[in-house]
């Protein structure tokens, strides 16, 4: 995400216990946590060590976050630092700094074992208590929806595309003037204390591109349930100068028809000439009934039940995976509003969110 260069006007800050991982990061600022407890090493896939490291470095974390209006925390759940430190960072961001705090995390693959899955679920529950909005993406869906001939790298790029577009859609809404402008207050209205949320992205070009992209966004195979009944929806329609009012209306109608009748719907459009004939649509839906927060679209007996197959973007269309490992980041948006994005990285590959892995 750091090397892609697609998120403009931001400052990335890497956070980790592992000094070696920080050295390999291309982030503008690198923050080592838990020096006394970990001696510059990783957390050994132990969430307690990750939590202790963050607690030890509370003041340092608070210092780098101070002044931010919005904080994104991204982590791979199930390991040590990501699972243990993320809730502490979230608590600091929301309660001490007063920032709108959004977490985007991944759940481990089945092959990573029961222990990591249990640790992931426990970490997610703790994280949920300290954020305004929590978006969970199950890595297992990558295996379920990928075509047989697609490589592992292509699958990771698809997930990277989802995460990258999700973060970019929010930052673009705030920082890039569009046909329909949205500011930070609009984003905050949808995402403050929203609880569990869903994120979907879609893209298309050619005839009926708006309809196809909108349908893809609201039925993304990486989503565990539909956006039906959401009481808060934030979506961004991005395209070049040939984006028409009719296309905006078509896409908006598809997205909003599934929402709660009284939903707070915030949308904006951004002009990006680099898209050419392509339209990209990102949707974040929140404010579901409590009984839907435990994803009803997945069997309780099999939390990774294979969803209906839906075409994913071709590898050439997704955001490039950075060449170098990116342990973590914090994003500060330039201009009137400052937005921090923290991605907590850990010491081994399986701890790194699938969308951030670069070596397999």
Task: Give the positions of each predicted feature.
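Tubulin/FtsZ superfamily GTPase core signature
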Residues: 1-360
């Amino acid at each position: 995400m750091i090397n892609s260069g697609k998120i403009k006007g931001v400052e990335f800050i890497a956070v980790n216990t592992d000094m070696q991982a920080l050295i390999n990061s291309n982030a503008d600022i690198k923050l080592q946590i838990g020096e006394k407890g970990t001696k510059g090493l990783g957390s050994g896939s132990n969430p307690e060590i990750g939590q202790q490291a963050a607690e030890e470095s509370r003041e340092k974390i608070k210092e780098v976050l101070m002044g931010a209006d919005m904080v994104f925390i991204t982590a791979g759940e199930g390991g040590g630092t990501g699972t243990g430190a993320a809730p502490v960072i979230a608590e600091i961001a929301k309660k001490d700094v007063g920032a709108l705090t959004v977490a985007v995390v991944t759940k481990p693959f089945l092959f990573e074992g029961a222990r990591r899955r249990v640790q992931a679920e426990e970490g997610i529950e703790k994280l949920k208590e300290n954020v305004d909005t929590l978006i969970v993406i199950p890595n297992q869906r990558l295996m379920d929806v990928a075509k047989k001939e697609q490589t592992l790298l292509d699958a990771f790029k698809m997930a990277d595309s989802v995460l990258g577009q999700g973060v970019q859609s929010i930052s673009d809404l705030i920082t890039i003037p569009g046909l329909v402008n949205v500011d930070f207050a609009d984003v905050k209205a949808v995402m403050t204390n929203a609880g569990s949320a869903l994120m979907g992205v879609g893209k298309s070009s050619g005839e009926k591109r708006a309809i196809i992209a909108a349908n893809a966004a609201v039925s993304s195979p990486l989503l565990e349930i539909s956006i039906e009944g959401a009481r808060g929806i934030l979506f961004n329609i991005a395209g070049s100068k040939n984006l028409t009012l009719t296309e905006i209306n078509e896409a908006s109608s598809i997205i909003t028809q599934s929402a709660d009748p009284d939903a707070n719907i915030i949308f904006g459009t951004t002009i990006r000439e680099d898209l050419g004939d392509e339209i990209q649509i990102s949707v974040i839906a929140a404010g579901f009934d409590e009984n839907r927060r435990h994803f009803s679209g997945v069997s309780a007996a099999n939390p990774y039940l294979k969803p209906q197959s839906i075409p994913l973007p071709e590898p050439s269309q997704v955001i490039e995976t950075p060449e170098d490992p990116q342990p973590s980041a914090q994003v500060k948006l330039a201009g009137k509003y400052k937005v921090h994005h923290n991605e907590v990285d850990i010491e081994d590959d399986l701890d790194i969110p699938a969308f951030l892995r670069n070596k397999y």
